[in-house]
Amino acid sequence: MQIKTAEFLTTSPDVRKCPQTNALEYAFIGRSNVGKSSLINMLTGRRALAKTSSLPGKTLLINHFVVNTTTKSFQIVDLPGYGYAKRSKKEQEKLRKMIADYILLRQQLTCLFILIDIRLEMQKIDLEFINWAGEHGVPLVIVFTKADKVGVMKRQANISQWMKKLSEYWEQLPPHFVTSAETSQGRDELLQYIDSINPSVSVETSVENAEANED
């Protein structure tokens, strides 16, 4: 699958304000500072499509991007990161509700990509989030990020730890990919996966609906 264009569409404060289009949505989420924006930029081939920041927890809203290929149109959705402890309890609860409402209520959500920093050993909050999504029947994929920042042995050990732990909860393990925004590792594999679960959707129809929603 080759991406022709990728553009910012809109920002939504909650799922009820999300654009009413027929475009399938592929949402990306992870702990704060996991490299989510960098991964989205790498996938789309647009360096500044999703705003990156050295400060964790900068994404506070639901960001929608329209992606067009030669035959299909879909949306990439950048969700706020979870697990940023420096927020007030009220802000944390607001973000948790925003994230949960989108994941559980958004009919256009086709797949949830959960990002994991491959440099780190398994984090409890990531495991709990993956299992929560699985328990609610959400189609999901695990994406290990920052593969260029760690040696092969450490990378393989961390992935093995994850697969072993998940097998305690999952009868069938979710798909997983290893990526690097710096080297574009995993880009082709991720795009091929998205293409494989993305049925033919009219580019014209999706774009027209998105524009009508903006008007």
Regions found by a protein language model. Give the residues of each.
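Conserved nucleotide-sensing/catalytic segment adjacent to the nucleotide-binding pocket
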Residues: 69-109
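Short, well-ordered secondary-structure micro-motifs
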Residues: 19, 87-88, 123-126, 153-155, ...
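Canonical P-loop GTPase G-domain recognition
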Residues: 3-16, 150-207
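Hydrophobic aliphatic residues
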Residues: 43-44, 103, 194
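Conserved nucleotide-binding/hydrolysis micro-motifs of P-loop NTPases
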Residues: 58, 81-83, 119-121, 146-151, ...
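Amphipathic alpha-helical transducer elements in NTP-driven molecular machines
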Residues: 59, 92-96, 127, 184-187
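Conserved C-terminal guanine-recognition region of P-loop GTPase G domains, centered on the G4
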Residues: 97-173
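Conserved G1/Walker A P-loop phosphate-binding module
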Residues: 1-86, 203-215
